[in-house]
Swiss-Prot record:
It comes from Macropus fuliginosus. It catalyses: L-pipecolate + NADP(+) = Delta(1)-piperideine-2-carboxylate + NADPH + H(+); L-pipecolate + NAD(+) = Delta(1)-piperideine-2-carboxylate + NADH + H(+); L-proline + NADP(+) = 1-pyrroline-2-carboxylate + NADPH + H(+); L-proline + NAD(+) = 1-pyrroline-2-carboxylate + NADH + H(+). This is Ketimine reductase mu-crystallin. Expressed at high abundance in lens, but outside the lens it is preferentially expressed in neural tissues, retina and brain. Keywords: Cytoplasm, Eye lens protein, NAD, NADP, Oxidoreductase. 3,3',5-triiodo-L-thyronine binds at R47, E257. Gene3D superfamilies: NAD(P)-binding Rossmann-like Domain (3.40.50.720), ornithine cyclodeaminase, domain 1 (3.30.1780.10). Homodimer. Binds the thyroid hormone triiodothyronine (T3); T3 binding inhibits enzymatic activity.
Amino acid sequence: MSWSPAFLRSEDVERYLGSSSILLPALEKALANFSSGSEGGVVQPVRTVIPVAKHQGFLGIMPVYSASEDALTTKLVTFYEGMSPTSTAPSHQTTVLFFDPSNGSLLSIMDGNIITAKRTAAVSAIATKFLKPPSSEVLCILGAGVQAYSHYEIFKEQFSFKEVRIWNRTKKNAEKFAQTVKGDVRVCSSVQEAVTGADVIITVTMATKPILFGEWVKPGAHINAVGASRPDWRELDDEIMKNCVLYVDSREAALKESGDVILSGAEIFAELGEVVKGVKPAHREKTTVFKSLGMAVEDAVAAKLVYDSWSSGK
C-alpha cells in the first residue's frame, strides 16, 4: 500500500491554526522547556544557514525535537534580499516538515509562512505581557509587512492600547496597513514621530543598519526587535542596546546570529523562557528589549497544533 505525506497549503494552515492567541499557552511552555536545558527535553541546534551569494539569498535549516510535545520537525526557510521588484515570489518562503517521532516517517509537508508569522507574533506578545510598562497606552509598529499584520492582530486581542502608530520606509505600504486592519492606526512620516512617547515598540523591518535610536525612546519602554536576523544586520543603535535590559529567545542563537547583540556588545540578561519559569525577573520599570530570532521549537508547537487539528477532522 502506497503512502505519502499530507500536504497542507497556507489556507489549510490558516484554517487549522486560527488565531495566534491559541498558541500562547503552548509557546510559553515551550519557551520554559527550552530554557531548562536537558531537563526541558528540547533538542535544538542553532539554525544552519547556507548562503546563496550569487542570488543574494540564503537557505536556513531549523530542526528540533521537543519531548514534551513529542514533536519532531524541521523548518526550511529561504530569504532573498535582492528580489527583483517584478518578481512574484516573496522574499521569505518557509516550509515545515512534520515527522512521526516514533519511526521517522514524514507525516506532513506544511506551508510555513502562516506558522512563522503567527508564532513570531505570539512570542512577542508573551514577551510584552511580562516586560511592558504597567500602564501602556501607545503601541508603535515599525514596518508594514506580514509580521506587522500578525503582530497587530494578536496585540489587539491581548492588550488595550489607546493609540497605535505605524511607520514604514515606503509610506504607501503603511497607509495600506492602516486602511486594511480593524481599528484606528496613525500613519507616521518618520521613525522619530512614530516612537516618541510610545510604551511598546515592535520593529519588523528589513533594515540592515540601525533605524531606531535611543534618544527617541521613552525611558521604561519595551521593544520587541524582530527584524535584523543576520550577524551583520541591525535595527537598534548602541545606545538602546547597551542601556536596556536585554532578553532573548536563545542566548546561543543571539550570540551567533543577531547583529544587534553582536555588534553592540550588549550583555544578555536572560532568555524569555527564564522569565516565564520565574527564575529571572521581568524588569518592567526599566527600558527592555526582547531580541526575537525565532526558534525551531516554536515552529514545532505550531505545526503540531495544525497537524493534530487536521488529522482529527479527516
